[in-house]
Amino acid sequence: MAKITRKRRVKKNIESGIVHIQSTFNNTIVMITDVHGNALAWSSAGALGFKGSKKSTPFAAQMASEAAAKAAQEQGLKTVSVTVKGPGSGRESAIRALAAAGLNVTSISDVTPVPHNGARPPKRRRV
C-alpha cells in the first residue's frame, strides 16, 4: 500500500499576532492568528486530554495557552495582543501562561458579547 505523504508546515516568519482566548464555563479555547486573522496555531483544554469538569479549570486553560504559544513561536511569533471572550475561570491563567511562555503581550482587551436584553438566560442552578 502506498505511503501517504503529508505536507510539512511551512515556517512563516510572523513577528506579531493576535491571541483569541474563548473561556466558557465548560472549556477554554486559545487561538493564535496573524494580524489579518489567518490562524497560526490553536489549542484547547479538551484537545490536551482534559475531560469533563477538569476542562473548565484554570490549570487546563494554562496548559492550552502554553501549547498554543509553543506552536506559534515555532512560526516566529514574538509579540501578541490578547482578546478575551467569555465568563470562564481560565481567563487570567491563560494570559499569564502566554507571558510565561515567552510571548510579549502588548495589550489585553475584553470582547465578551453583552446582549441588549436578547434571549432569556438559563435558569439559576440549585446545588
Swiss-Prot record:
Q: Which GO terms describe its cellular component?
A: ribonucleoprotein complex; ribosome
- What PROSITE patterns has UniProt attached to this entry? RIBOSOMAL_S11
Query: Origin, by domain of life?
Result: Bacteria
Q: Could you mention a single GO BP entry for this protein?
A: translation
Q: What Pfam families does its record include? A: Ribosomal_S11
Q: Which Gene3D superfamilies match?
A: Ribosomal protein S11
Query: Mind listing the UniProt keywords for this protein, alphabetically?
Result: Ribonucleoprotein, Ribosomal protein, RNA-binding, rRNA-binding
Query: What are the GO MF terms of this UniProt record?
Result: rRNA binding; structural constituent of ribosome
Assembly mode: Part of the 30S ribosomal subunit. Interacts with proteins S7 and S18. Binds to IF-3.
Per the similarity annotation, which family is this? Answer: Belongs to the universal ribosomal protein uS11 family.
Q: Known PANTHER family for this protein?
A: 40S RIBOSOMAL PROTEIN S14/30S RIBOSOMAL PROTEIN S11 (PTHR11759)
What role does it play?
Answer: Located on the platform of the 30S subunit, it bridges several disparate RNA helices of the 16S rRNA. Forms part of the Shine-Dalgarno cleft in the 70S ribosome.
User: What is the name listed in the Swiss-Prot or TrEMBL entry for this protein?
Assistant: Small ribosomal subunit protein uS11
Q: Origin organism of this chain?
A: Lactococcus lactis subsp. cremoris (strain MG1363)
Q: State the gene name recorded for this protein.
A: rpsK
